[in-house]
């Protein structure tokens, strides 16, 4: 009887009370559905402010267009980069369940600070209608940035844990579980879009018509409700027990390999037969932790032996780390640890190739919003706030995600006779191609917008240009589609390909790519202004009015860089070999 009860338990997983997770009671689509609802509210809370933040900084904090754009990209970049911290802590010391609760509480605190500042005139710079206004400074600026970066810290932790927490609910040892997990990632992006839809319509309307205290207030309520909903699903979750620092494993293998290369000893005495998978160590560790709680009275009588790991020929320079006689016992590495580090290193070029796409996405939150603000934003008698422009890609994602999951993927599975239908890397590649097209469209639209401004004699005027903002929607549609293909593909790619002890950290690379894209955008803007502003010339992206910017040149540059990046991606993608079940084409 005890053996049957043991078999029904999820190895390496515990419930929220640190008791053994039980099959049929914990995990599955029901548990993951709580995560999907939470993602709607979490992204609503974040994007409601991020999408419109450039206008808040410019009009209420009186920052220049270029400074406000850079501050927004730095804020969003920091938020996504901190996902690495959330992913690391989820793998090493805490569960994804715990990291979400801690991070959501931090974001909640940051939003409270921003709400208080927005509703208190004495905490903001004086209102001003002239072209030159007093920029926020001193304690007021400190309060602004403390609030913003507390939000960034909270968002980072959530991004680094929530998607992994949902994906952990599925049994990857069965085809059904893997298909459900793939569906989860598609609908995770769908729910992200649902939250964005409310954010860029209702909340942005509140910010523009009722005041920013209303916008921050709604975000505060949304993140608070998300915590309550997440907690309500606690009894259904299976929580992966942390296995120790994945960075320690990576650094140990790299250091051991370096020492071996520098020594005169041969690496031929590495033995595979003595090594076992870190994930199995993790399971053993998890079982000991649960047993210490008195939940597991006896270990399994007949434990299946893990498959023996074998050194592969790829990245052979690391094979020396699996030496049976290391220089120091602290540098002792198993063969499986060496192979796990190889997997992570092989994924890094794919990760790097997605940064440029996210650099293009950064333009949606900065220059594109400012372009739309100069155009006619009326549709009939309805006036659309410029920050609501993302509604176009958001709605497209909400339409395309179910079609992709229920029509395209089943057809692709039948056509290719594979479990995935479309491989993760193929999906990412489609997104990269769409980003190239988006930048070309953006350049053509900007040529038209500036032509209207010149013909109307409004190059230096703040008056609305007689051209509809729907032209800007074209680039949003292309970039929105690119985001759907790339983000969902990246999340699933990193989760399925990464070693089980490093999955949260690996999945957070999807968000770190976004972060580096935003930072790269700031760097490119600075470099472009520095080069084009030399010899007394006017920089491309600086001037009294955005109508004087050479944004069309900038977008063409982004198009060329994106095309070069795609060729770089093809080089690595065509040489990549999948390791996980269900990922092979």
From Swiss-Prot:
Tissue expression from the record: Expressed in root hairs and in epidermis of both root tips and mature regions of roots. Detected in shoots, stems, flowers, siliques and imbibed seeds. Expressed in vascular tissues in cotyledons, trus leaves, hypocotyls, roots and inflorescence stems.
GO molecular function, one term: symporter activity
Family listed: Belongs to the major facilitator superfamily. Proton-dependent oligopeptide transporter (POT/PTR) (TC 2.A.17) family.
Protein name: Protein NRT1/ PTR FAMILY 4.6
Keyword S-adenosyl-L-methionine: no
Role this protein plays: Low-affinity proton-dependent nitrate transporter. Involved in constitutive nitrate uptake. Not involved in histidine or dipeptides transport. Involved in (+)-abscisic acid (ABA) transport, but not in gibberellin, indole-3-acetic acid or jasmonic acid import. Mediates cellular ABA uptake. Nitrate does not compete with abscisic acid as a substrate of NPF4.6.
Keywords per UniProt: Cell membrane, Membrane, Nitrate assimilation, Symport, Transmembrane, Transmembrane helix, Transport
Induction of synthesis: Not regulated by nitrate. Down-regulated upon nematode infection.
Spans traversing the lipid bilayer: 28-48, 75-95, 96-116, 142-162, 184-204, 211-231, 343-363, 391-411, 428-448, 465-485, 508-528, 554-574
Primary localization class, coarse: membrane
Keyword RNA-binding annotated: no
Topology class, membrane: Multi-pass membrane protein
Example GO biological process: response to nematode
Domain of life: Eukaryota
Phenotype upon loss of function: Reduced effect of ABA on seed germination and postgermination growth and increased number of open stomata.
UniProt-annotated location(s): Cell membrane
An annotated GO cellular component: plasma membrane
SUPFAM superfamilies noted in UniProt: MFS general substrate transporter
